[in-house]
Each structure stands twice: as structure tokens, then as C-alpha cells.
């Protein structure tokens, strides 16, 4: 006979299936089709027989645990929905007579392997679905449509931003040196911004506003690509380098933390292998961001959307012109990381006491 606990399990299983608003029914079954063992409502084909969940579980446990039953009567007990838990021997024999096959019951190792296969297949289907969605929204095949803008922005970026900044400070005062340096770098970013025609439609205060809010992140984007992945070091001014510090980050001084943040950004972007087109377009996007202005948001947003489309179209393609749908999402998640990290550095780059470190980061050479 089955234990009280087993009886409760069978009843609970039956109750759960009954409580569902629309019980799942395989296409090969008819509504109300009975279990061939006990007559309860069947749920499907289990081990080659149409059975209920209770008889399926009973048969599986019996085979897996190699349980041997004995009948207290003459081995002819009636097995029904009500009496199925009275004699386990006769219930198991009826399972066998009605086609349930012991060889189809998986052992623990086989069950784990099957569960893993199901999970892997589910993840594969999710990935295929994601790839389908990405492909549907892909702009890779529209690159020709944006080529003129891409070429224009890239050429101007290389012409202006690739010029190494060398500077001889005029003052010995830290505060004045910081002003000199800020003007120098922001002027370079301004020159690049002015090559995009929308700049001509902005008034002077709006121009200053977008440069003031973007020059640092644009320059940092450029700096972190002066990264040597082989040596894992950042190339700095006056032929110096920065190698990652050892020890606990929380125990580092303020300046070292800034360099560590730059290294982390560099490592994150290095795996993306961005080319000049992507750097140029992303820099333009960082400048012409609607969040950088209080007014003219609609005007800025128009060029912002166009630049996004240009960047997406080239970021979805490999160098060999084959499609790479996952490169764009991976690129996208790094952009807010860049913006957030640089925003946390603002105070450091506005502190005159950090002028030497700031010059080391932003300039190619200085005296």
C-alpha cells in the first residue's frame, strides 16, 4: 500500500490540474479522456500510455527507486481513481499491462542531461528570437543611404581631433593653467562641432552650452583609445604611461582612482575595436545630444537621430561587410557607461589642484 504522503501527493497533483482555468490538452487527446490505469482525467502520453499525472509519477518513482511491492490479497485488486492508492502492486501491474514501459524512465543522470538540453534549447530559441528582432530593426543594409554623412563627419573628426595637443603654459598659477587647458581642449571640440551644419542654426549661448557639456566626454572617448592592450597601459602626455594599480580600489587616492576608471573604460571599449567612423559619429552624438541644451531640443534631436542611424548602420557590419547583429547592442550598453563614468569625473577635472594629472590625460605634450 502507498503511504499517506504519497496519497496526498496524488490528490494535490489532481487538484492542481483541475484548478487551471484552461488545462493544457495535447492535440492527440480528446477532452475527458480517462487514464488507462485508474480512470482519472488523463493529461497525456506518459511512458507510452495515456495516463493521469498521479499514475505517471507513481510509475516513475517505482522504476527509479526499484521498489518491489506485495499484494495483501490475491493480486487482482480493482484500480480506480478512488482505490488506486490501496494496492501498489496491482496498480503497478496494471501500468505495465496497459503499455507503460520501464525503459523509458530516465535515471538521475539522464534526467539532468535532458533538463540541461531543454534549458539549452530554450535559450537557443530565445537567442534566435532576439536575432530575428535585431535583424528586423537593422540598418546595416541602409549604410549607403547614410554614407555621405558618415564620410563627412569622419573626415572632419580625423582632420581636427586627431591633431595632437601640445601646449606650453603661460602661467605658473594652477587656476590659470586650468583655464588655459580647458579653453584649449574645448576649442578643439568646438571646431569639430562647427563642421556639422546644424551648428550654424544655434545662437552663441546654445553653442557654448553644448560644448561646455560635451567637451570632456568627447576628449575622454578619444583618450581611452590611446590604450595599449598588450601592455594593458594608457598612453599619456610626454611619452608617459599608466599601468593599472594593485590593491583595493577603495584604498586608492583620488587621482589614482581617476586613472583606474580610465583604464576600465579603455578595456571595455577596446574589445569593441571601434574605427574612426564610429569614434567620429559617437563624438558628434555626444556633442549634439538634446540633453545638452535647454532650448532647441527638437532641432538637436533631428540631427541626433540621423547620427544614431549612421552609427548603427556601420556598427552592424564586420570589416568584411558581413552582418554582426550583436555588435550594436554590445556597443550601445557601453555608451551610457562612458557618459556616467565621465560625469563622475567632472569635479576632478574642475579642480585646479589636479592640473598636472589633467594635463597628463588630455594633452600629448606640455611644459
UniProtKB/Swiss-Prot annotation:
Listed PANTHER family: NUCLEAR HORMONE RECEPTOR, THYROID HORMONE RECEPTOR BETA
Family listed: Belongs to the nuclear hormone receptor family.
Entry GO MF terms: nuclear receptor activity; RNA polymerase II cis-regulatory region sequence-specific DNA binding; zinc ion binding
Primary site of residence: nucleus
Species in which this protein is naturally found: Onchocerca volvulus
InterPro entries hit by this protein: NHR-like_dom_sf (IPR035500), Nucl_hrmn_rcpt_lig-bd (IPR000536), Nuclear_hormone_rcpt_NR1 (IPR050234), ThyrH_rcpt (IPR001728), Znf_hrmn_rcpt (IPR001628), Znf_NHR/GATA (IPR013088)
Subcellular location: Nucleus
Pfam families reported in the protein's UniProt record: zf-C4
Domain NR LBD: 145-367
Official protein name in the record: Nuclear hormone receptor-like 1
DNA-binding region: 32-107
Family matches, as PROSITE patterns: NR_LBD, NUCLEAR_REC_DBD_1, NUCLEAR_REC_DBD_2
Gene coding for it: nhr-1
Keyword annotations: DNA-binding, Metal-binding, Nucleus, Receptor, Transcription, Transcription regulation, Zinc, Zinc-finger
